[in-house]
Regions:
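Serine-hydrolase catalytic machinery in alpha/beta-hydrolase-like enzymes
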Residues: 1-60, 155-159
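C-terminal catalytic histidine-bearing segment of alpha/beta-hydrolase fold enzymes
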Residues: 136-183
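Generic structural signal for well-ordered alpha-helices
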Residues: 45-52, 128, 132, 176
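Short beta-strand/loop motif that positions the catalytic acidic residue
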Residues: 108, 114-116
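Acidic catalytic loop of the alpha/beta-hydrolase fold
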Residues: 119-123
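Primarily recognizes the serine-hydrolase "nucleophile elbow" in alpha/beta-hydrolase
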Residues: 48-109
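Short beta-to-alpha linker loops that shape the active-site pocket of alpha/beta-hydrolase fold enzymes
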Residues: 20-24, 97, 150
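Short alpha-helix in the alpha/beta-hydrolase fold that links the catalytic acid
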Residues: 4, 124-134
């Protein structure tokens, strides 16, 4: 996540990566899964809303709006943040689950680019289709892209077994274009 924040900063965006695990860090996928399952989602959502509020109050973001992106659980949290925080003007979740209830997407104030892996037990076709239906129903500008031949975490270049460079580069280009156009 630090790498993604650094990439965004290198592109000229103010970037903030809140520490939702309060100092607990791991590079092991199994341990990361355990941390994720133990995370208090209500508290995490509140912390993200505070972080977005902090960024929105900074002079270097004044009047521009805030973007949100995240991966896996963070993708779901980014979507939820966009539903709950009107200062979010663009959101780009990667293989995230949907907010609950799904009709919260009616509150989203900007366009959505959602990137998904073709083969993903976490955020599979039912998740993608539900999000597309809800965004369409509520008249929200969106693009939902499924990357053929990819698996969950295809953007993560530290996990060579699932990383797919072409898909990751395409998705990143779409995130940057979304943010440049809307923030």
């Amino acid at each position: 996540i630090k790498d993604v924040a650094t990439r965004l900063a290198a592109e000229g965006f103010a970037a903030l990566a809140p520490d939702l695990y309060h100092g607990k860090v791991t590079k092991e996928p199994d341990e990361a899964g355990k941390l994720m399952m133990a995370l208090d989602m209500t508290r995490a959502s509140k912390e993200l809303a505070k972080a977005a509020g902090y960024l929105a109050a900074q002079p270097y973001t004044a009047g521009r709006g805030i973007g949100a992106t995240g991966f896996c659980m963070g993708g779901g949290l980014a979507l939820t943040l966009a539903c709950d925080s009107p200062q979010i003007k663009a959101v780009a979740p990667f293989y995230g689950v949907n907010p609950s209830p799904i009709d919260k997407v009616a509150n989203i104030q900007g366009p959505v680019f959602a990137a998904y892996a073709e083969h993903d037990a976490w955020a599979g076709p039912a998740v993608r289709e539900e999000l597309a239906r809800a965004l369409t129903q509520h008249g929200k500008q969106h693009e939902i892209k499924v990357y053929p031949g990819t698996e969950h975490a295809f953007f993560n270049d530290t996990r060579r077994e699932v990383y797919r460079e072409a898909a990751a580069k395409d998705a990143w280009g779409k995130v940057l274009a979304l943010f440049r156009e809307n923030l």
